[in-house]
């Protein structure tokens, strides 16, 4: 090959073709064609051995988080959330409405119903502590249990 105009004086530019698995394009190397790879390494320009650059296995990209389906048990989820938040309670109520609407026939509107959601664990523990202090035959024991369940009224659809 002939030296290119941009090459340094006294050096030749040659293209060394590497295996397709190692490189996708030829790599220009400065040096003379009669030098061995060891001699080129002495000049400060190492030529990688093709065996070290070969790709032996390609992995498929990992799935994105948005494509993963994650299911939560409603009761477990309510234990982790503050159900005193009205907007959050409406979200749970609306999700039940969607399930009922998909099951109902076209033209029929599902009747609104009250849903019961368990209160967060911190309110249950307070009520349970009150129960433990009272004797089992105490008539006030029943209201303590009722306090641990929140009733959520669904808005009527007109």
From Swiss-Prot:
GO biological process, one term: regulation of signal transduction
Region Disordered, annotated ranges: 1-38, 96-158
GO cellular component labels: cytoplasm
Superkingdom, natural source: Eukaryota
Annotated transmembrane regions: none
Residues recorded with modification Phosphoserine: 95, 119
Compositional bias of kind Basic and acidic residues: 125-141
Keyword terms of this UniProt record: Phosphoprotein
Pfam family, one: Dysbindin
Record-stated family: Belongs to the dysbindin family.
UniProt-recorded name of the protein: Dysbindin domain-containing protein 1
Phylogenetic classification of the source organism: Eukaryota, Metazoa, Chordata, Craniata, Vertebrata
């Amino acid at each position: 090959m002939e030296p290119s105009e941009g090459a340094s004086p006294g050096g030749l530019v040659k293209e060394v073709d590497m295996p397709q698995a190692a490189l996708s394009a030829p790599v220009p190397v400065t040096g003379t064609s009669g030098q061995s790879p060891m001699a080129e390494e002495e000049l400060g320009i190492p030529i990688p051995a093709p065996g070290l650059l070969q790709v032996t296995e390609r992995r498929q990209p990992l799935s994105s988080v948005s494509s993963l389906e994650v299911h939560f048990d409603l009761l477990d989820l309510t234990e982790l959330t503050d159900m005193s938040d009205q907007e959050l309670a409406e979200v749970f109520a609306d999700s039940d409405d969607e399930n009922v609407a998909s099951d109902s026939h076209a033209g029929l509107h599902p009747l609104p119903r009250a849903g019961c959601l368990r209160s967060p664990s911190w309110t249950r523990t307070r009520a349970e502590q009150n129960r433990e202090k009272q004797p089992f035959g105490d008539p006030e024991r029943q209201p303590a249990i009722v306090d641990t369940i929140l009733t959520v009224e669904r808005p009527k659809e007109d």
